[in-house]
Amino acid sequence: MKIEEVKVYNFRSHEETVVRFRKGINLIIGQNGSGKSSLLDAILVGLYWSKKLRLRGLKKDEFRRIGGKGGTRIEIKFENDDSKYVLFRDFSRNVAYLKVQENGKWRHASEPSMESVSSYIERILPYNVFLNAIYIRQGQIDAILESDETRDKVVREILNLDKLESAYENLKRIKTNINLLIESKKSFIARTENIEELIKANEDELTKKLSEINEISSKLPPIRGELEKVRENVKELESIKGKISELKIQVEKLKGRKKGLEEKIVQIERSIEEKKAKISELEEIVKDIPKLQEKEKEYRKLKGFRDEYESKLRRLEKELSKWESELKAIEEVIKEGEKKKERAEEIREKLSEIEKRLEELKPYVEELEDAKQVQKQIERLKARLKGLSPGEVIEKLESLEKERTEIEEAIKEITTRIGQMEQEKNERMKAIEELRKAKGKCPVCGRELTEEHKKELMERYTLEIKKIEEELKRTTEEERKLRVNLRKLEIKLREFSVMRDIAEQIKELESKLKGFNLEELEQKEREFEGLNEEFNKLKGELLGLERDLKRIKALEGRRKLIEEKVRKAKEELENLHRQLRELGFESVEELNLRIQELEEFHDKYVEAKKSESELRELKNKLEKEKTELDQAFEMLADVENEIEEKEAKLKDLESKFNEEEYEEKRERLVKLEREVSSLTARLEELKKSVEQIKATLRKLKEEKEEREKAKLEIKKLEKALSKVEDLRKKIKDYKTLAKEQALNRISEIASEIFSEFTDGKYSNVIVRAEENKTKLFVVYEGKEVPLTFLSGGERIALGLAFRLALSMYLVGRIDLLILDEPTPFLDEERRRKLLDIMERHLRRISQVIMVSHDEELKDAADYVIRLRLEGGKSKVEVVS
């Protein structure tokens, strides 16, 4: 991968930054707080932003630029495997895409989403490889020395060993599946051992069943023939018996019907006599109707007029009352409208004045909002200082650096003492060995060597060795504690180094805050809020007045409409009174008296008309009953004739039916049906059994074939199993060999770089693979020593050497290295060495991007980009 261009918008101190990178060593240089590391973080976020980064505690709010217009956006152009890519992320809209150029045209390389883009980049360059071998972050140079397991994970990903391990495990599963198949087939062969016997037994049973089927099939036809004859005889006798029963029922029904007709005739004759008497009575009442008709006509006319008159009168009086009240209310509202019109004009003038003043105050309110944002940022940054002031942070950092120097000097002094003690111990042990071998003269003092003198010297040297070992143990423990303290101190140093950057940001923001006149701005804001509240209140009142004035205007038309309705109602009322007078009445009371006089005649007329209607109805019913009586007599004669015919037929049928013969035939029919049913059921049972036996035979023969196939397949599976086991062994051996060769190469590169850093003090870096661990050792004076032997500065140098070795190993596959401030924890001599290493080693990597505030590194760079902070914004300047 080679990064060609990075565009950053509203990311931390970067408002709009465009940086182009070239092949070779690219150096981004600038003072602390100028946005150098932020640019590298933008590359990390741009490439890998996903749940993984969010779970590590990185949030959008932490890198979104305060006061920035528009959202945070990152665009990265890079090249990989001779293909050009453009990656874009917009964090405010949660939009992302990755495009690749093919044949001069751009197409989407993945789904356009945050997670899909990150997944695609992960396939090109895994996140853990990028973070541990490609991108060496500020203060994290020696972090890879902390855990053997983490280091092993990085090495596995760099070497693609995970794929081999996956293949190894997949083959293990295949081996298990093959074994299961072999066991399954062996089990099947064991289960089907007596297959030939089962086939023979089923074939014998089939022959037996087929013989019985033939026997039953020959018996059935004659029995079925006799059954059909008997069934016909029984059917004929049952038909006669049924007809006899049916005729008996019909005769009984006809007799019942005859009785009913006789009773009906008696009832009709009685009803006819009663109706004749009632008709005579009603004819006497009806004869007075002509006399009453004139009075009834007058009554109806007057009563109809009165009802209509009273209804219209009530309606008109009610409407007049309602319209006159509404007219009065409208006139009052119209009078009030003039006052509201004047108030509306007064409010409009006041709103214009307030609006003008609000526009004047708006810039002050916006400026105060910016100031508040700066205050919030200062508070958030101060919270990260854990209660310390910026000055206290600088003071604490200086104190920690001083303490680190003291501990390193103490470790150096102790290391020298340990070396001296080990030398003294070795000298004493060498003297004891020489004394054991010596004869004649003493190798120590030159005197004659007696056994007593020899014993005395050896005891003295042994005692001295014991004292040296005790002192060595105490001193080694003291050194271990100092190194533990040094590691803790370096963690604090990294923490306070970050806090120092935060403190500088706070100073910059506080300086910016001083540029705001907060007291004046807050006063303007209070005035703005008060005027805004008054403006909204007046605006609401004006809207209410305007609605009222619109309603008043509409009421003018309503008033004219109501006045017209009142006029028409009064005309209609006068017309109603005129109609009353035309009938000859001066008042409604006179009309009611006449209606009361006519009511007696009306009641008599109504009663007579009811009787007239009843008379007509009775005469109609009388005629109907006479007709009904004639019909009943005719029906009675028909029923008597039908009874006589049915009884004759019944007598004839009874002479043809013999009950004893019928019962004998029925018993024979049941017996034959049972016999046929039994034989048929047995035949069906035998046929089903034959089909089952045939199916069983087919299955058994298939199993026999499968059994033979299973024997052949077992042989094939056993051969395949042998091949799988052989392949697993080869993968395991290759993985071990590949890892060993790679670690040897990484060890060679790291040894060369680390030896240069330490002026040859440490001759080698040993990288050794163990189960799920990759361990590191250094060689000092020909002996392997653990990393606890190193001073703090030497650990930084080793961390840098190992990371550079990983990057150098990746040359040709991933030609990219990113270094963020590699020099802060290196002394002057090691910084000088780093320049030499850059010239001799980093030149092999196609592209190196390095961030530093150290001007010395410019000499080793091919392309220098300078960042500076102006007005809280990062600015880019290409130096060379």
From Swiss-Prot:
Lineage: Archaea, Methanobacteriati, Methanobacteriota, Thermococci, Thermococcales
Subunit: Homodimer. Forms a heterotetramer composed of two Mre11 subunits and two Rad50 subunits.
Annotated organism of origin: Pyrococcus abyssi (strain GE5 / Orsay)
Listed InterPro entries: AAA+_ATPase, ATPase_AAA_core, P-loop_NTPase, Rad50_ATPase_archaeal, RecF/RecN/SMC_N, Zn_hook_RAD50
Note describing how the cofactor binds: Binds 1 zinc ion per homodimer.
Alphabetized GO MF terms: ATP binding; ATP hydrolysis activity; zinc ion binding
SUPFAM superfamilies from the UniProt entry: P-loop containing nucleoside triphosphate hydrolases, Rad50 coiled-coil Zn hook
Gene this chain is encoded by: rad50
Family designation: Belongs to the SMC family. RAD50 subfamily.
Record-given protein name: DNA double-strand break repair Rad50 ATPase
Keyword Membrane belongs to the record: no
Cofactor entry: Zn(2+)
